[in-house]
Each structure stands twice: as structure tokens, then as C-alpha cells.
């Protein structure tokens, strides 16, 4: 019994000593935080000097190297390990836009990472996206050099360019074509019978129904309404598909515009 008590007494002393040392370290950290706080300086470097740090960008690599250098400076041993490989990289350049004309304005917008930029300043007319095959056929000749307003409310992701996205768009186009056919019959009946029956609504909740066709027609880019504050995420297909190369990257801009400015332009 006496031996047992001595062991427990020894363990209790060790625990007290350990807790005391831990408390001293915690108190020192709190003191430094109160008297020599560097949080805002570090945040300034990361957000203003380095900026956005999407994976696959030079800014991400710069941020990793800077953080590693700070840890080394504080006496820590640092080892950088590769977490994975991306098929292509992405560096964001400057962006700006302006609506020209009588009610001109500076445009407030973002573009998702890993989407296409422009080759310098691109000026063009604005069109509303087509919802049926007949609408596309009528406006096809006007699409070259146009900025196209597309439907839907964006939350940061780019237009879905995947095969699944193509399939969804094709199904809605087919449905809209049938609705347009019914609407033509309704209009004929209204004219013939002097009635005023309402037309059936077309589906427009999925953006850029004729995405590939409009790209092939030579549009400058797509503009979609986005809620404020604006969010710019990334093209998931490029990030997760190792078969992507510089030869099959997106080539048309995908702009997410302040919803209020979008509404003003659409009017």
C-alpha cells in the first residue's frame, strides 16, 4: 500500500509540473497576442500582397513558400509535401468592364477560376440568349462578336460544360420547342377567334441552353446575373479531370454580373 501511494504521489507531482509549464506557455502566447499581435500584418501579406490563392496558381505557391518561411523563422522545422497534381494551372489577371451608351456604368462582376479570359479589351453588342431552336436560327447571324445575357441566378460556378450539362440543356431545348409549337397554335387560334388566351411559358431556369452552338457562332462571352456579394468559384471539370490540357480549355468568357446591373441591362 505504501508503494502505491508513493507512485500516485509521484504522478501527481509530475501532473502539476506539466500543467504549470503548459499554463506558462499559454500565458506567454496570450501576452504576445496582446502586446505584439502580427495577425493583421500577416493577413495583409496574404490578402493584399499575394491575393487570391486558388490551387494551381502561382499565388498559391507563393503563399505556401511565405508561410513556410515564417514557420522556419519562428524556429519550426518545415517540410513541404506534394498534395496532388492538376492538369493545368490558372493565374488570374486584371478584370474590368463598362457599359457604353447613354446609361453607361462601370460593371461590377467576377469570373470563376479556370474559365477563359479575353485577349485585351473586347467591345460588343448585347443579346438575350435564345430559348428555342427557331429563336437560335433567327439570331445566329447576330451572335458573332456579341455578349450574351444568359438566364438563371448564379452562386459562383461557371456554366456546366460537361456531357451531363449538354444532356440537360438538350432536353430543355426539346421541351421548349414543343411549347413554342403549341404557342404558335394558340396565337393562330387567338387571331382566328378574336380571343386572348395566354401563351405557355418557356423553361429558362437552366442557363446557356445553346452554349456550344453560341460558342461556335463566335460570341465574346456570357453574362449571368449573380447575387451580391459576388462569389467566384471554379470550373470543377478542369480541376477533377486529368485529361484536360491546354488544347481543350474553355475559350469563351463566363461573367457573373451584379444582379442589379444585369437587370438594368436586360431592360
Which residues fall in each region the model found?
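Noncatalytic luminal/extracellular "stalk/propeptide" segments of secretory-pathway proteins
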Residues: 35, 44, 48, 52-186
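Bacterial Sec-dependent N-terminal signal peptides
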Residues: 1-23
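Surface-exposed loop and adjacent secondary-structure segments within mature catalytic domains
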Residues: 163-177, 216, 223-256
